[in-house]
Amino acid sequence: MTEQQFHSGFVSIIGRPNVGKSTLLNKILGDKIVITSDKPQTTRNRIQGIHNLPGCQIVFIDTPGIHRAKSRLNKYMVDVALSSIKEVDVILFLVEADTKPANQEETILGALASAEAPVVLVINKVDLVAKESLLEKMAAYSGLYPFREVIPVSALTGDNTGRLVQVVRDLLPEGPPYFPDDILTDVPERFVVAEIVREKVFRLTHDEVPYSVAVVVESFKERDDGLILISAVINVERDSQKGIIIGRKGEMLKKIGMQARREIEELLDTRIFLELFVRVSREWSENKQMLKEFGYE
């Protein structure tokens, strides 16, 4: 790499739930930008972490774990994870050193068959296994897919993550940086909150309200005591839809708010105050400006 060359690109971290994707990203960046938990599915949307190096910018994408989707939200999360495979320059497939390949890994390997980007196998939690066991795991996975590299790491301790970053750097194409060098991440909590509220609208109103509902989080503030204040607007196209969502004496809107609040609190691992409003935005689904404002373009 000469002084005139700059390399940049997007790198997707994929794997089954709770394999350590968020922990790895936080360790590489040297800061906690992604919620981590012992519970699977802590990450519910793609989260970008920007790693700036001399002559290089790596934009990491931490995706939801790929799993068997059951709920609408889970299907959305899996779609987000799988779609990232088609949009990046390098793919990091993260597995655990202390577990054998299972159905979830086979599902991911099947999806990788159509990937055009080079795939690096990252074997996490090497601090938990003996060297002989690690070598067996590396050989087993290498026989399942033509990985560009196989890198053992410990996301918890940071062992060998420097080598991983160097491998990624060498695989990136030439190009200018995508973000200013003082930007660490673009964390879309408000977009995830909007999706959760929208799902509750669909579930609680059933077929009474069509899918022409857009939720916009207009305010997202954290107080000194840790309480997060969220204000969101549920946009509908007709007055009759507004009445259904509000319900008799406001009971339906109250239910939507209560169920959404519980799920958001579990996601963010803190208390929240959720304030919901319903607004008639006539024919918003056909209005280019409104579509842009609501985040659909």
Swiss-Prot record:
Residues 205-282 form the KH type-2 domain. Residues 124-127 are annotated as: G4. Residues 153-155 are annotated as: G5. Residues 7-174 form the Era-type G domain. Residues 15-22 are annotated as: G1. GO terms for cellular component: cytosol; plasma membrane. Residues 62-65 are annotated as: G3. It is a peripheral membrane protein. CDD domains: Era, KH-II_Era. Pfam families: KH_2 (PF07650), MMR_HSR1 (PF01926). GTP binds at residues 15-22, 62-66, 124-127. Gene3D superfamilies: 3.30.300.20, P-loop containing nucleotide triphosphate hydrolases (3.40.50.300). GO terms for biological process: ribosomal small subunit assembly. SUPFAM superfamilies: P-loop containing nucleoside triphosphate hydrolases, Prokaryotic type KH domain (KH-domain type II). Keywords: Cell inner membrane, Cell membrane, Cytoplasm, GTP-binding, Membrane, Nucleotide-binding, Ribosome biogenesis, RNA-binding, rRNA-binding. Belongs to the TRAFAC class TrmE-Era-EngA-EngB-Septin-like GTPase superfamily. Era GTPase family. An essential GTPase that binds both GDP and GTP, with rapid nucleotide exchange. Plays a role in 16S rRNA processing and 30S ribosomal subunit biogenesis and possibly also in cell cycle regulation and energy metabolism. Monomer. This is GTPase Era. It comes from Geotalea daltonii (strain DSM 22248 / JCM 15807 / FRC-32) (Geobacter daltonii). The lineage of its organism: Bacteria, Pseudomonadati, Thermodesulfobacteriota, Desulfuromonadia, Geobacterales.
